[in-house]
């Protein structure tokens, strides 16, 4: 009955993951349905996507609260932790889908506004609550995952200030500090699953680069003074 002990790379087999599984399922559904809509232009794919968006972010009886106070709790020790914010990484796909669905007649204006308002509120929470502020500057993949989420949510809601911060963080911290001259990630290579964590890290960094790059500031082509760049990481 005592508090659980943290062991890197291991999870508690009795932990509650139903909500996380639901979020993963949502990201898969939105990604698939919105892709089908964009390829075919058929509303039969947009309509169910909108139903899921309404259930999660609009309807008072079913929508998720725009906060993560109880993420990655540890029995007997913590009711929630800052690193739990990484679990909403699956909402990146959802935010991207909501943006791409904007021209669908099925996604009426009032619903679009409600979805954007939800993501704006959650973005504000991860950028002001102590959990979010700690995760924002976390020195490994958690910090980059914060930025990927914030980038997707800011892109959907039009928050250029956040996007500018992430772009600067990518150029001043993620590449020159988290990546070495050979394209490796020292903090991830020290862990129990170095290969998997390294692949995850470059995947998340690629997502950040894709969202916040501009014609004038292409993070895919950016090279640090010490020679770190996305090409080496890939």
PLM regions and their residue ranges:
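Short, well-structured alpha-helical interface segments that form or flank functional binding sites
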Residues: 24, 28-31, 44, 51, ...
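Short, contiguous, pocket-lining structural segments
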Residues: 82, 86, 90, 111-118, ...
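Extracellular glycan-targeting catalytic surfaces
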Residues: 1-135, 171, 175, 179, ...
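Long, repeat-rich segments with strong aromatic
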Residues: 148, 152-234
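Contiguous N-terminal and early-domain "leader" segments and peripheral loops that mark the onset or edge
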Residues: 1-16, 138-152, 156-158
């Amino acid at each position: 009955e005592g508090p659980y002990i943290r062991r890197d790379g291991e999870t508690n087999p009795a932990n509650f993951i139903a909500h996380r599984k639901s979020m993963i399922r949502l990201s898969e559904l939105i990604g698939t349905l919105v892709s089908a809509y964009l390829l075919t232009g058929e509303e039969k794919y947009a309509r169910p996507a909108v139903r899921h968006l309404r259930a999660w972010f609009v309807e008072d009886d079913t929508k998720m609260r725009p906060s993560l106070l109880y993420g990655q709790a540890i029995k007997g020790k913590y009711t929630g932790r800052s690193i739990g914010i990484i679990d909403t990484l699956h909402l990146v796909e959802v935010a991207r889908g909501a943006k791409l669905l904007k021209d669908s007649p099925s996604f009426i204006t009032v619903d679009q506004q409600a979805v954007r308002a939800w993501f704006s509120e959650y973005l504000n929470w991860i950028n002001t609550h102590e959990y979010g502020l700690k995760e924002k500057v976390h020195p490994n993949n958690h910090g980059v995952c914060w930025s990927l989420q914030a980038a997707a949510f800011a892109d959907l809601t039009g928050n250029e200030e956040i996007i500018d911060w992430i772009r600067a963080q990518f150029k001043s911290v993620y590449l020159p500090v988290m990546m070495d001259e050979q394209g490796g990630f020292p903090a991830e290579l020290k862990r129990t699953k170095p290969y998997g964590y390294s692949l995850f890290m470059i995947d998340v960094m690629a997502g950040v680069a894709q969202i916040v790059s501009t014609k004038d500031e292409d993070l895919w082509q950016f090279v640090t003074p010490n020679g770190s760049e996305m090409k080496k990481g890939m």
